[in-house]
Amino acid sequence: MDVLYSLSKTLKDARDKIVEGTLYSNVSDLIQQFNQMIITMNGNEFQTGGIGNLPIRNWNFDFGLLGTTLLNLDANYVETARNTIDYFVDFVDNVCMDEMVRESQRNGIAPQSDSLRKLSGIKFKRINFDNSSEYIENWNLQNRRQRTGFTFHKPNIFPYSASFTLNRSQPAHDNLMGTMWLNAGSEIQVAGFDYSCAINAPANTQQFEHIVQLRRVLTTATITLLPDAERFSFPRVINSADGATTWYFNPVILRPNNVEVEFLLNGQIINTYQARFGTIIARNFDTIRLSFQLMRPPNMTPTVAALFPNAQPFEHHATVGLTLRIESAVCESVLADASETMLANVTSVRQEYAIPVGPVFPPGMNWTDLITNYSPSREDNLQRVFTVASIRSMLIK
């Protein structure tokens, strides 16, 4: 894997810097490195593809070295270099695709394609060994079963979940009280509602709670907490739990009271915040518990009082909500996040070449399915294919 990264890094630098008119002295070190790559690869044969619709391709390396010059690089020099670069880039691209479409239930962190296994040989270590990529660094750590650490921005840690629970219900669905939520990606939105605006509740207050368990532990997380849930701020028609009917939700938004968010690890509270909004942090956690209250306003203008009558019908429904968004965090496991395209890269290649469903990943690389059942086998394979996708993205956009 590190050899593949080094190949890609050398080729990217060569493609960017070996251009007509450049002084040879400015790129002499790069050309020496480029020639070392050619020397190491010459005389070797590889085969890629042969799975799904990914075609079999054979690769043979027999290239001349780039020479030295006291002057600027001319058109002939650059054309010779470009022919070599283009062949190598095509080779790296196909090795990456060949690796990205394979999976294994055992030792999925190790190379799975014949071409990458061959590149793992000791003789290829002479190719400008470079371990500067976060993905490569963590792949090496995971390969040795040592602790890894990925930094993510808006990590897709929450499987998609959108539903509701009713704490008070009746067949007519005209005086409901409960909670509805939408968890997806890096964000939780939860709303508590009471059609009667807590008119008969103790102290005219309804208590709500929402607990979310993560599939992986996050550490050093920067989080935004807001006293609102905008996705539940407009009228909608909702299917009943049994699917037999629908009910109408017409929210009027109040500010939540006594808001508390707890971050827990293995059942132990690590961080707690009360009535604090904006940016907060959490050291390490695998569970988030949100609790908040809906309090009937003790004093209301006639207009507000008309919204919340003391008896049915309740045409407007008192609602309070919270939004929690993980802006950045560190995780030992690889995840999809907002700043990278690894999941899309892997998925698009597998779709384009009609790769059959294997023993590890769900059909279509469905992220909600994948993260919901994030087994050690999936974790190993995902880290490997994301690492390869990061290498491919250096050359192929």
UniProtKB/Swiss-Prot annotation:
GO terms classed as biological process: fusion of virus membrane with host plasma membrane
PTM summary from the entry reads: The N-terminus is blocked.
Q: Which UniProt keywords apply?
A: Calcium, Capsid protein, Intermediate capsid protein, Metal-binding, Ubl conjugation, Virion, Zinc
Transmembrane residues, as ranges?
Answer: none
**Pfam families recorded:** Rota_Capsid_VP6
Q: Domain of life, per the record? A: Viruses
List the SUPFAM superfamilies hit by this protein, alphabetically.
Answer: A virus capsid protein alpha-helical domain, Viral protein domain
Q: What HAMAP family has UniProt attached to this entry?
A: Rota_VP6, Rota_VP6_A
* Leftover remarks: The VP6 trimer contains a zinc ion located at the center of the molecule. The zinc ion is not essential for either trimerization or transcription activity of the DLP. Zinc-depleted VP6 has an increased sensitivity to proteases.
According to the record's subunit comment, the protein's assembly and interactions are: Homotrimer. Interacts with the inner capsid protein VP2. Interacts with the outer capsid glycoprotein VP7. Interacts with the outer capsid protein VP5*.
Query: Could you tell me what this protein is called?
Result: Intermediate capsid protein VP6
